[in-house]
Structure formats: C-alpha cells, structure tokens
Amino acid sequence: MKMPMGNSGMKSWRTKTGTRIYRVLNGRCNCYLVSKDNRFLLVDSGTKRDWNRLNKGLDKLGATHASLVALVLTHCHFDHAENAAMLKNTYQAPIWVHKSEGDCLRNGENPVIQGSIPVTKLMIELLNRTRRLGRLNYAPADYARLVDDRLDLDTFGFPGYILHTPGHTPGSMSVIIDNEIALVGDTLFGIFRGSVFPPFAGDPKLMVQSWKKLLDTGCITFLPAHGSERDKEVLKRQYDKYNQL
C-alpha cells in the first residue's frame, strides 16, 4: 500500500503487517529505508553528491548507528555504492553484498557496465574507447556479509528476505518485504511507461529469468532504483514479452 507523503516529506509504502518503506533518496538513484519496530535496513547508498541529502533523510527518520541494522547493496555500480564507505564510517553500518561482487566493493571497482539496447551498447562502446568508465570507481569499503542465493531477514527483525536476481550484474539482489513489496535495484527500471526493461544489463536473458523469480515471490509492488514503482501486472506483461525472444 502506498502512503501519502507525511511529515518526513518522503514517499513511503506500508505492508499489511505494518512494515514501512521510505524512499529516503531519489534522483540519480532511489534509495529505500525499511523500518520495522524502530530498526532500519537501508537499501543502496546513492552517489557522493547526494550524501548530505541521504544523511539528512536518515537523521529525520531516526536511523542511528544503533538502529541501522545494515546497508544492503543491490549491486556494486557506483551510483548504488558510492556512499557505502561513508555510511560505514558514520553509522557503523555493516554492508551486505552478493558474494560475486564482494571484491568489487572492497576494491571500489565499478562492475562492468553493458548496454542492453542498441543506443546504450553504442554509448558504452564510445565510453570504453575514451576510458571514461574507469572514472566511475569509488571509495572501497569492507563488507560484513556475503549473500548467496537467499538470506532470510527474520532473524534481523524484518519480515522478508534477500533474493539473488542476477542479470543486470552477476551479483544483483532484491529485497523482498512481507511477500508484498520488492526493492529491486536495477533488475527492472521504472522510467518508461509500461516498460521495466533496463537500458543496461550484462545478461538480459538471465535478467528476464530473474523477473520470473520476482513474480514468484507474490509481491504486488516493485520499487526500482531508477524511476517509479511498477505493479505486478506490468512486470508480468513484460516477462511474457521478453521471455519469448
């Protein structure tokens, strides 16, 4: 269920069991804060230019070093991980990342970016020629936990789990809350009307299979890191379309 903007000024959602999800940062990358019984789970960290906004948003919602259980990186592209080191230093937040991208985080290396449509394939080719993609590295940070195919969150105080949803990158993950709302990173986009297909993906076919995994969770709302929310019906139509290709 989507909630109107409250005193925090942030868009938020609430599941049937009362778990709240706040969009604590938007713009270059949507970052979400899951709230349950005064405990918080941050999903993605945004870019360093957004650090002040992220920090203010966390403070406004009452997230502290004692209540912020972890930072979950849906993957280690710079626009999701650039503030990871700052969050660890400021909030002592443990960082959770998929095991296939742990070295990327430790080295501050941006995983390979690949276009999934003709225009972005050309764009990446041109950027590679000029070596500009090498400028997308970020401050390294140590992870506290490596996630495999699934990590249950109940033991950490949250009704849900982390699910490996590869395709955009090898280590892309989604956070499933109450089998109702999924925080999906870049596994799907919400920019173009009626579409969820990301313009960048290392393995588009594998990504489409990850859509099936997301549909199987029973979630009805999908919150991407780029763009606006998408519902189950849109995702199902897109899965049916691209699964036939």
Describe the function of each predicted region:
Residues 6-10, 133-158:
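Short, conserved active-site entrance elements at the starts or edges of catalytic domains
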Residues 33, 66-90, 102, 148-149, ...:
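Soluble, non-transmembrane catalytic domains of enzymes that act on hydrophobic metabolites at membranes
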Residues 53, 83, 234-235:
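Residues at alpha-helix caps and immediate loop-helix transition turns in enzyme cores, especially N-
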Residues 48-49, 135-136, 159-234, 238-241:
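Metallo-beta-lactamase
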